[in-house]
Regions:
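NTP/phosphate- and nucleic-acid-binding module
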Residues: 1-573
Length: 573
């Protein structure tokens, strides 16, 4: 038995116009439908309708985590900064980490993740292999001081996450936990009606060497990914790696200096030589994290990938300023590997290793070389994976052309290994009585982000189209003349019947025009609408509308409860 909500009492202030700063459909519709309100940049209040959906997502997450053998707990939001110093992350995390002193001068952080906290929690308790594996999770507000919060709930400064942490004695046990979490996340996405793709991902500041993200496909998603239709490979652009096919540059293989007046761009040089941009080499002048000069070279039609570059040059690397270019003897638009000034490290993309005929800058204004050959004409200090993989590049598994898409990261699973346990002294005794570091895994589900992902994938020109499993209410009962006794009597009969069936019902009992009610209910997106109109009541029927398909049918008053209950229960996951 459920209890109905009446819109005359519901706090859901809808908006007629789109908010000016809302870029994504999910941001725009959640604001317009009276579900969230912005308090400050990246900070939102969840109003009653959104909070009901959030709770449903949380319960789906709990159900799947519990089924996978994980145990729920709760850890504090405030974390002693000393734990972050133990792990070595306090400075590496950067300005996104919210840090502050309490009244006693002790430093704390607001947890964006809780690896340090959970490691400290178990390090004096999990001391034997007999106690392992253990998987602990919590659902909590997290904090990250984003430089540019945007996209509503997609990239906020405060957000709701489910984080789980596994502790194992062996790599095989870690893999088992990892596989269970991947399956749990696939189940969560399916039950929330989120169309998501598991993709190979970079582990970032959390660490570890193996990670999979679940990306909700969305044209307006903030993340880029590539995938193969033939073999199923998928990866985000931070982790996607393949051998880019490159074209040899113009010329006969002899190092030749060519005058190229004013041609300081890849496009201009390629046009001048009558060659595709892929046949040129793009040289980028950088300052690495240690403040040392570097030139990175990639195929002319590809871009330097920021995440990959951080792995090679260190977090905080940057492009050279004009002053630094001059100080290092470099000329913007004409930089190349031949005759590179002394003291500059040369790093080239792995895809260029076999290429023997480069078109590149000559390190002299208005000149380029053709026929430049590695080792013969210049020495490469390091070959590395530097480029962003794009549509058309070969799949690293089967060689077929990759496709590109955009997505929203809703969850991620990591194999952390011993990064935190070694740094923080979390050890156990194995079967042979030897002390070893705990082997850790972690995984996170963005609960508030999942809410936005559902809306991003389920909407139309009229508003949100909630799937039943996460809808704030499953059925809207809309009496068009709530002041008439006949209408009120039938309305109460239907509402009582639906509530008795355990259906979640909202009743639009407001004294408003029918058009206003229809527009508001379509905007809020309840899966089914039962409309009580004057003409239908005379005929002993009500109108049943499926919000997702727009289909309408007249149903006898004494049959509508059974029909709606059947539809809703079949659609629940």
């Amino acid at each position: 038995m459920t209890r109905a909500m009446y819109m005359s009492k519901l706090y859901a202030p809808t908006l007629k116009e789109d908010p000016a700063d809302a870029e994504l459909a999910s941001h725009r519709l959640l604001l317009r439908a009276g579900m969230i309100r912005k308090e400050a940049a990246g900070l939102y209040s969840y109003l009653p309708l959104a909070w009901r959906s959030i709770r449903k997502i949380e319960n789906i997450v709990r159900d799947e985590m519990d089924a996978a053998g994980a145990q729920e707990l709760m850890m504090p939001i405030m974390v002693d900064a000393e734990l972050w110093r133990e792990s070595g992350r306090i400075d590496a995390y950067g300005k996104e980490l919210v840090r502050f002193d309490d009244r006693h001068g002790r430093e704390f952080v607001l947890g964006p993740t809780h690896e340090e906290t959970v490691t400290a929690l178990v390090r004096n308790e999990l001391r034997s292999y007999k106690q392992l594996p253990v998987n602990l999770y919590h659902i909590q507000d997290k904090f990250r001081d984003e430089f540019r919060p945007r996209f509503g709930l997609m990239r906020g400064r405060e957000f709701i996450m489910k984080d789980a942490y596994s502790f194992s004695a062996t790599q095989e046990s870690l893999q088992e936990e990892y596989d269970k979490m991947k399956q749990a996340y696939a189940n969560i996405c399916e039950r929330c009606y989120i169309k998501a793709l598991p993709v190979v991902a970079d582990s970032g500041e959390i660490g570890g060497d193996t990670s999979v993200e679940y990306m909700a496909l969305a044209d307006a998603g903030e993340a880029s990914l590539v995938y193969c239709d033939d073999c199923g490979f998928a990866a985000d652009d931070e982790a996607a790696s393949t051998k880019v096919v490159v074209t040899e540059g113009p010329g006969d293989g002899t190092l030749t200096k060519v005058e190229t007046p004013g041609m300081g761009t890849i496009e201009a040089v390629a046009k001048f030589f009558g060659f595709p941009e892929n046949g040129t080499r793009k040289s980028l002048a950088l300052i690495d994290a240690e403040g040392k000069p570097v030139v990175a070279i990639v195929p002319g039609d590809h871009e330097l990938n920021d995440c990959k570059a951080e792995h090679v040059f260190g977090k905080g690397y940057r492009m050279m300023t004009d002053e630094e270019l001059q100080a290092n003897g470099l000329h913007k638009g004409f930089i190349g590997p031949v005759n590179l000034p002394d003291g500059i490290r040369l790093v080239c993309d792995e895809s260029l290793r076999e290429s023997k005929q480069w078109a590149c800058g000559a390190n002299e204004v208005d000149y380029h070389f053709t026929g430049a050959c590695p080792e013969r004409d210049f020495t490469v200090d390091e070959w590395a994976d530097l480029v962003t993989v794009v549509a058309g590049d070969p799949c690293p598994h089967c060689g077929k052309p990759l496709s590109a898409a955009r997505g929203i990261e809703v969850s991620q699973v990591f194999q952390l290994g011993t990064k935190y346990s070694e740094a923080m002294g979390a050890t156990f005794m194995d079967e042979d009585g030897k002390e070893k570091p705990l082997i850790m895994g972690c995984c996170g589900v963005g609960v508030s982000r999942s809410l936005a992902a559902v809306v991003e994938q389920h909407n139309d020109e009229h508003g949100i189209v909630w799937p039943v499993s996460v809808a704030p209410y499953e059925v809207a009962v809309i009496p068009l003349d709530p002041k008439k006794e006949e209408c009120t009597t039938v309305c109460e009969q239907i509402v009582d019947g639906l509530c008795a069936e355990g259906i979640e019902v909202v009743v639009d009992d407001r004294d408003e025009r029918p058009g206003f009610k229809f527009a508001d209910n379509d905007l809020m997106g309840f899966p089914y609408q039962v409309v009580l109109g004057k003409r239908g009541l005379k005929n002993g029927t009500v109108e049943l509308k499926d919000r997702a398909t727009g289909e309408r049918e007249d149903v006898a008053i004494d049959e509508v409860v059974a029909k709606v209950a059947e539809l809703v229960k079949a659609a629940r996951r």
